Amino acid sequence: MHGHGGYDSDFSDDEQGGGSSKKRKKTVEDELLLTKPFQKERHGKVAHKQVAADLLDREEARNRRFHLIAMDAYQRHTKFVNDYILYYGGKREDFKRLGENDKTDLDVIRENHRFLWNEEDEADMTWEKRLAKKYYDKLFKEYCIADLSRYKENKFGFRWRIEKEVISGKGQFFCGNKCCNEKEGLRSWEVNFGYTEHGEKRNALVKLRLCQECSFKLNFHHRRKEIKSTKKKSKTTPECDESPRKKSRSPPSEEASKGKDEGHSSSKKSEDSRNRNAEEEDSASDSELWKGPLPETDEKSQEEEFDDYFQDLFL
């Protein structure tokens, strides 16, 4: 029995069911109209486990990256080593590097240094050779520093000077022997230096300045070539020799008269010779003008003048 008063109807349930279905259709249509094309779907359910795991991994990676950036290189290295031992096993001694084959810049320069570089040496340049060549370019190659400790065996060692030695005057104003600081009585020597370098025999002509004692050591077996200063000699006009006095003396009156006559005659002769010389010079200059262009005189450049000046100053 449905309804009130004991009356029931077969159409009452159908009307109620039809109204609810219409409402549902309207809500679905309204939602479709109100949704935007780029709007994401609503998750009414719990997220999938894989989605949650990806979010957690991303957050953990962000935190780990932040901590690694805050560390320095050594701290990062120790952390990675500890993590490797923790997760994969092993001993800490396995991660210690051997320093037997380590080389410093000084070791590389000693292995690849050359006393003189030529074009063949610069053909195949590795980073070791470039480092040695860069050091070679900083050396001053005017005078050498010598090692005369084995002079009795006729064995000598030579090297170029560094900037500190050039500033202090070692090898130029002081003795060029590395164990001597004498600055008096220095002499310049030119030595043909024969040496073996990288299995190849070479020769080089070097200059050095030594004191008297060190010069004796250098020339202990045979004498080397000494460089002497070549100063320009000043041109001096030869003076006329005085004529010897005559033994026979004339009286003073005759000598006075003769002196006057000789003075007048010599003055006239000198004037005539001057006039003739002036005329000859004028005629020669006029004739030379028509022969051709004037010969070019070789003038010394400023660098050559400085070289001559310093050569006279230092030697």
Curated annotation (Swiss-Prot):
One of its GO terms (biological process) is mRNA splicing, via spliceosome. GO terms for cellular component: nucleus. InterPro entries: Folate-sensitive_fs_Fra10Ac1, Histidine_acid_phosphatase. Keywords: Acetylation, Nucleus, Phosphoprotein. Transmembrane segments: none annotated. Residues 1-28, 225-308 are annotated as: Disordered. The modification N6-acetyllysine is found at K36. The modification N-acetylmethionine is found at M1. Residues 225-235 have a biased composition (Basic residues). It is found in: Nucleus. May be involved in pre-mRNA splicing. Interacts with ESS2. This is Protein FRA10AC1 homolog. It comes from Mus musculus.
